[in-house]
Amino acid sequence: MKIRRVRDEEYAEIARLRRQTIRSVNANDYPEDVIDSWSAKTGAQDFRKSADICKRWVALDVDGIIGFCEHNLKCEVSRMYVHKDHLRKGVGSRLLEVAEDSLEKQGCKKISIESTVTAKDFYEKNGYKIMKKTLYKGKKKQPIYRMTKKLFKDKYS
């Protein structure tokens, strides 16, 4: 597996991966109307519009793009999706590690994530703590977890 920065021509494939992941993986934890609303939102153009305020990576293997992660400039990992056939194989953990390293270099001392019900355990296993359970403020209210992780401890922590 190789991880590198996203290229502009890959946004359509990333948008497809996002939709497929929501429909196949997240569908176990959310009702169909939420999945329909959530998976319909983002296309390649939406990714391009936010390219200036996000850093993005893809995980690749011989099959092509198998995962995607982004963080914004506010010390938040804002999106991560891993192809259903590559779950629990280290893809998400490796993408998260790359994003965390980037955020640390950006000067962040703590990372925030709004996690789905589906991904909550993954983030907990990677050192994130639940701060609050809330509802996503989209058209369809879906439960999410506001989670944080300290990137490094100083001697007074």
Give each language-model segment a name.
Residues 109, 113-120, 126, 132-157:
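C-terminal "cap" of GNAT-fold acetyltransferases
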